[in-house]
Structures are given as C-alpha cells and as structure tokens.
Amino acid sequence: MNALVAATTGLSLGISADAIRTGLAGYSGIENRFTVVDAGGVRVVKDYISHPTGMRRVLAAAKTLSNGPITAVFKPYRFTMIHYLGDEYAVAFKDADRVVITELYTAGEVPIPGVNAPWLCDMIRNNGTPVDFIPEMDDIVGHLESLLPSVSDASGDTPQVIFFGGDDLFRLADGLIERLGSA
C-alpha cells in the first residue's frame, strides 16, 4: 500500500514509471525493523520497536516463521512508559517462550518508586512467560548462548532471538550473530 502511494505521488510529480520501478525494486525496507540474520542455526531479529503493541505484533509475526522457540530480549525504555503501559507489557510477550530483560534506560527521567526492570519482569512472569533479568548488558550474549543449545534441541525448528530496543541492543545482536556464525 505504501509503495502504491509512493508510485502515485511520483507519477503526479512527473517522475517516470521506469524510475519509480527502479527505485521500488532497490528498496529493501527500513533498517532495524524486523531485520533478520540467520547465524549458526539461529534466526536473530533486530527490531527498533519498544511499544508493547508493536512488540506483540512482531512476536506474532515471528511465530509464523518457525515453530522453534522464541527468546525476546528487551531493554525497557523510560519509567513513565513502563509505568503507564506496564499491563500491556505484561501480555506483550505472550508469543515468546522466554524473555531476557536488562536494566531500564531512563532517558533522564526521575525514577517512579517501585517501577523498575525487576518490577516489569514480575509483571511478565505473572502472565506465564519465563523471564530472566540480566542487569549487565555485557552478560546478555553469554546468557543467550547458554539458552540456545537447550532450546534448539527441543525442536527441529529454527530458534529465534528477537532484540527489541535501540543501538546498544543491536550491538549485542551483532555480537551474538558473530559468535553464532563462528560456532
């Protein structure tokens, strides 16, 4: 639908159909929105989304790609967002087999008493999804590697690790890809 609107707009501005066709053919999508890399028998996905509705949709889409286990990795963003959308986050991970959460990115906000990453972990866990709280970002890739042999042995389908967040989590995803690729 977006391509149709872009093409129509281009034509109305006098851009040739051939130029539009070439442009659309070369478009590979938005970087870090469901960016998929297969490495070492694991599908690693990077997605910039941090709103629970979008995360729920990404996980539902990932579930259609493989019957293998899904591990979601999330760095919560802002006290206010986690506080006001806590109930939505609690159910957003229902299609994940496991969630790994690290410390909250505060974006300079004043803390809200009782609202923190362990609180969010409890909310998700209370909705039936296993959660691991890994406060140190440097420990996440090793933790994921320790999970993957057991989850990949559990089924014949490709396990998926989905990183939700921003640049620091994407660097972790790249580190996991590098380590899996050499495994």
Predicted segment positions?
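Residues at alpha-helix caps and immediate loop-helix transition turns in enzyme cores, especially N-
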Residues: 54-58, 84-85, 112-116, 172-175
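A glycine-rich beta-strand to alpha-helix segment
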Residues: 140-179
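Short, flexible loop segments at boundaries between secondary-structure elements
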Residues: 101-104, 179-183
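C-terminal helical cap/extension that packs against the catalytic core
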Residues: 90-156
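Short glycine-rich anion-binding loops that position phosphate/pyrophosphate groups of nucleotides
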Residues: 76-79, 104-107, 166-169
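Nucleotide phosphate-binding/pyrophosphate-handling subdomain across enzymes
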Residues: 1-98
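Thr-Gly-centered strand-to-loop micro-motif
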Residues: 45-46, 108, 134, 163-164
